[in-house]
Amino acid sequence: MARKNAQAEDLSNVEFETSEDVEVIPTFNAMNLKEELLRGIYAYGFEKPSAIQQRSITPIVKGRDVIAQAQSGTGKTATFSISILQSLDTTLRETQVLCLSPTRELAVQIQKVILALGDMMNVQCHVCIGGTNLGEDIRKLDYGQHIVSGTPGRVFDMIKRRVLRTRAIKMLVLDEADEMLNKGFKEQIYDVYRYLPPATQVVLISATLPHEILEMTSKFMTDPIRILVKRDELTLEGIKQFFVAVEREEWKFDTLCDLYDTLTITQAVIFCNTKRKVDWLTEKMREANFTVSSMHGDMPQKERDEIMKEFRAGQSRVLITTDVWARGIDVQQVSLVINYDLPNNRELYIHRIGRSGRFGRKGVAINFVKSDDIRILRDIEQYYSTQIDEMPMNVADLI
C-alpha cells in the first residue's frame, strides 16, 4: 500500500489507490439488495449511489474487510448503513453490528440514518454514548438490538459490564477513524476489538490515513479491499461560492443582519471559529431581534440534541455553530452556509460547505473576509480548483 521507505513519514500523502478488483455498480437496483431496504433507500430520497456507494456496498455485503478513504459529504454514512442493513438477520434479536465513531452527534446521526433506511425492516438500533442514562442503555440492550452505534469509551464500558454481548457480532465499523485516534480513543478501540469474535468483518472509514491507522488496519484486517474517493468527488460542484469583503471585523455583523431575510428563505448555518464567538454572535443577533439558535461543543449533550432536533424539524431556520457541526451532521434542507469566520484550514472549508449541496442538491456559500483573509480565500480556491466570486446583489434569487 505504501512504499517501504515512506513508513517513517506521515503516510496520509502516499498514493492510496483503489484496489484493482473493485467493481463500480451504477445503480441501487443493480446491487441485489433486499426489497424492503431498496424501498427505504428511495423513500429516504436517494436516487443514484454516490461514488463511494457504487464501489463499497457490494464488497462489504460480500463480507470483505474494507478500508475506505473518504470525507464527510461523500455519502459514507449511508454506504455502511445500507451494507449493514443488507447483512443483518433481523430474526436474530442479538447485536450483530457495532459502529464506533468519534463524537456523540455522529453516533446519533448514524443511528438515525440506519433507522430511516431500515424503516421497513423492523430493525433495532441503539445509541451507546456517554452523558446518557446507563439504566436506559441496559434496558435497551437487554431487549435485543441488531446494531449498536456509539463512542468507543461507552461501548467498551457496556461490553465490560457484559450488558452488550458480543457473541453474535459479525461486523465492526470504524467511522472517521482518524478523528477517533485524534481524540485519544486508540486504547478503547483496541479494547473493544479484543472482545469481538475472531472472524469479525472490519470496515474502516477515514478522511486521512496516517501511520497509526495503517497500523490498526494491519492488526484488525485480513486482505482488505481499499477504496479511495478522491477529493474531486467530494463535491463543491453545484455550490455557488461567494465572498463579501469587509474592512473591519465589526462590519461582519451588519452584513449578516442585511442578509437575514435571505437566510430564512431556506435554512442556513453560520460558522464561527470559536465557541465564544458563537455565544457572542447569538447574543448580538437576538438583541437585534433576530431569531437564531446556536450550538457548540461546550453545551450539555441534552441541549445539543434538542437544538439539532428543532433545526432538523425546521422549527429554527438559522443555526450558529462551530466546526463541531461540520463533521458528519446532515440536515437536508440546508442550502446556505455562511462562514462568518473563514475556517482555520482548507479541509474544514469542504467539511462546512460540502454539506449544503449533497448529492446534487444545490447550495450557496458566503464567506465574510477581511483584507488579510483574502489570501487564505485564494488559497482555498486554488486548492479545490473552484471559483469564489464577489457576492452579487441578487443573491436571494440563487438560493
From Swiss-Prot:
Domain Helicase ATP-binding per the UniProt entry, residue ranges: 57-227
Keywords: ATP-binding, Developmental protein, Helicase, Hydrolase, mRNA processing, mRNA splicing, mRNA transport, Nucleotide-binding, Nucleus, RNA-binding, Transport
Catalytic activities: ATP + H2O = ADP + phosphate + H(+)
Annotated Gene Ontology cellular component terms: catalytic step 2 spliceosome; nucleolus; nucleus; pole plasm; precatalytic spliceosome
GO MF assignments: ATP binding; ATP hydrolysis activity; mRNA binding; RNA helicase activity
Record SMART domains: DEXDc (SM00487), HELICc (SM00490)
Motif Q motif per UniProt: ranges: 26-54
Motif DEAD box, residue range(s) on this chain: 175-178
Gene3D superfamilies named in the record: P-loop containing nucleotide triphosphate hydrolases (3.40.50.300)
EC number(s) stated in the UniProt entry for this protein: 3.6.4.13
Enzyme class: hydrolase
Matching SUPFAM superfamilies: P-loop containing nucleoside triphosphate hydrolases (SSF52540)
Residues the record lists as binding ATP: 70-77
Source taxon at top rank: Eukaryota
Binding partners and assembly: Part of the mRNA splicing-dependent exon junction complex (EJC) complex; the core complex contains btz/CASC3, eIF4AIII, mago and tsu/RBM8A. Interacts with btz/CASC3 and mago. Interacts with ncm/CWC22.
Function, in words: ATP-dependent RNA helicase. Core component of the splicing-dependent multiprotein exon junction complex (EJC) deposited at splice junctions on mRNAs. Involved in exon definition of genes containing long introns, including the rolled/MAPK gene. Has a role in oskar mRNA localization at the posterior pole of the developing oocyte.
Entry similarity comment: Belongs to the DEAD box helicase family.
UniProt xrefs under PANTHER family: ATP-DEPENDENT RNA HELICASE DBP3
Protein name, UniProt field: Eukaryotic initiation factor 4A-III
